[in-house]
C-alpha cells in the first residue's frame, strides 16, 4: 500500500508498506539521493516474510517533495522525517535498517529517539562519534584518520553532473553502481540498469539530484548517546566497501554500546542480487533476537 506522509510544513513524503499488517514493523532508510526504491523489491519481499516493511522516499528523491533550493535543511531533518513516517503509519516502535547516509540517520534515531526503536541495523557508513578506533594491536586511531572513499569512486564523484539526456544519465548511474559494488561480486549491468529504469519511472524524470550533498551536516555527532544506548544494534561489515572501508564497520561496533558485527560476504556499497539472501538472513536473525 502506498501513501503520502506530511512530514513537515510543505514536505510530503512518498511511502509504501508490504507484509502482514500485524507483523513487527521494519523501517528501511536509504542513502543520499536514493529513493525508497533503492531497496530492491526482491530484498523487500524477503524481509516482508516476517515483517511489515515500510520504505519511503527522502525529501528531494522519488515522488517526495523536492524543495531544497527554496527550503534548505540540515541532514538531521531527514532523521525527523523517519519519525514522521512511523507516526503516519501509526507505529509506536520499529526495527530500523539504514544504509549509507541512511546509516547515519539510523544512528541519529538510536541516539535521539531510542524509545521508538526495537532494534537498529547499520550498513555502509561511518560512526557519528569522536571516539578513536582501537586497532587489534591496541593502537588508537582518530576517526578522521581512518581510510576514506576509494580513489576510483572519488574520481567518479568529482566529474560534473551534466544533463545529457535520459539514456546518458542511465548509463552514468550504472557506472556508479559498478564502482560502488566493489570487485568481489561480478557486476550485473543488466540488473543495475533495470533497477535504475524503475527508479526513473518512479520519480517521473531522470535528472540527478544533489540536495543531500548540499545539506548542512553539522550537529551530527552523538558520541555519548551511542556509547550509552540500550538499542540492540547490528553493524554489517562489507569486505568490498569503497565508501566506508574497513575498519569503519569495526569502529561502529566499538562505539555503539553492545553492537554486533556481522559480515556480508562479497558485499560492497550496493545491493546486487547476490547479497539479498545473506543480508536478509542477517537482518531477520537480528530482529528475531529483539
Question: In which residue ranges do the predicted regions lie?
Answer:
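Conserved hydrolase catalytic core segment
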Residues: 92-136
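Flexible "cap/lid" loop of the alpha/beta hydrolase fold
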Residues: 120-163
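Conserved alpha/beta-hydrolase "acid-adjacent" motif
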Residues: 242-248
Amino acid at each position: 500500500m502506498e501513501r503520502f506522509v506530511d512530514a513537515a510544513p510543505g514536505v510530503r513524503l512518498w511511502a509504501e508498506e508490504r507484509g502482514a499488517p500485524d507483523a513487527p514493523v521494519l523501517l528501511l532508510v536509504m542513502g543520499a539521493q536514493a529513493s525508497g526504491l533503492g531497496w530492491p523489491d526482491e530484498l523487500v519481499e524477503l524481509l516482508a516474510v516476517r515483517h511489515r516493511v515500510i520504505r519511503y522516499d527522502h525529501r528531494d528523491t522519488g515522488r517526495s517533495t523536492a524543495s531544497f533550493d527554496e527550503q534548505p535543511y540540515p541532514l538531521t531533518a531527514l532523521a525527523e522525517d523517519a519519525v514522521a513516517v512511523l507516526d503516519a503509519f501509526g507505529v509506536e516502535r520499529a526495527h530500523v535498517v539504514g544504509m549509507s547516509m541512511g546509516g547515519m540517520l539510523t544512528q541519529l534515531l538510536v541516539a535521539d529517539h531510542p524509545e521508538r526503536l526495537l532494534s537498529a541495523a547499520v550498513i555502509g557508513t561511518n560512526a557519528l562519534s569522536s571516539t578513536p578506533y582501537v586497532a587489534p594491536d591496541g593502537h588508537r586511531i582518530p576517526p578522521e584518520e581512518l581510510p576514506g572513499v576509494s580513489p576510483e569512486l572519488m574520481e567518479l564523484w568529482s566529474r560534473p553532473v551534466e544533463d545529457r539526456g535520459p539514456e546518458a544519465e542511465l548509463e552514468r548511474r550504472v557506472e556508479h553502481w559498478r564502482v560502488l559494488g566493489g570487485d568481489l561480486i561480478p557486476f550485473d549491468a543488466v540488473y543495475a540498469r533495470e533497477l535504475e529504469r524503475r527508479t526513473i519511472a518512479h520519480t517521473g524524470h531522470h535528472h540527478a539530484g544533489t540536495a543531500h550533498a548540499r545539506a548542512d551536516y553539522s550537529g551530527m555527532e552523538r558520541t555519548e548517546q551511542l556509547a550509552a544506548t540500550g538499542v540492540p544494534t547490528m553493524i554489517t561489515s562489507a569486505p568490498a566497501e569503497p565508501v566506508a572501508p574497513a575498519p569503519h564497520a569495526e569502529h561502529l561496533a566499538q562505539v555503539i554500546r553492545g553492537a554486533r558485527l556481522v559480515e556480508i560476504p562479497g558485499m560492497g556499497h550496493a545491493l546486487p542480487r547476490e547479497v539479498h539472501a545473506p543480508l536478509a538472513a542477517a537482518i531477520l536473525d537480528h530482529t528475531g533476537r529483539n
